[in-house]
Amino acid sequence: MTTLARPTAPLRADCIADTAGGLTFDVTVDGRGGTAHLVLRRRDGHEEVFLPLTPAADGRLRAALPSSVGLPEGCWDAYARVDGGERRLMPGVMDLTAADGRVPYETRHGNLSLRCGR
């Protein structure tokens, strides 16, 4: 008898833009042991930015992308790397009222990406 693997629930990240031009990502993950990072990978290049995911007050993991971290213009795909495994992030709630030049968005495949430019 063959047993099917239980499908893994998608990881979602809520995004909040601040008035200084930074973004905060809140990610809900299962089994929060070990090292965790939010990875931004430039779609048309080989550049990656690693942001530490740290425990937040609500039990989720939080990463901050301050305005001082320069990202070249383009589209950046968002991933969560937890305990050595990497998974594509899907968008959750997005409060982009203060967004300026860095805009998280849902791709046509339902994934979370970040568009940078002026």
Task: Please identify what each model-predicted range represents.
Residues M1-R118:
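Basic, ligand-binding patches in group-transfer machinery
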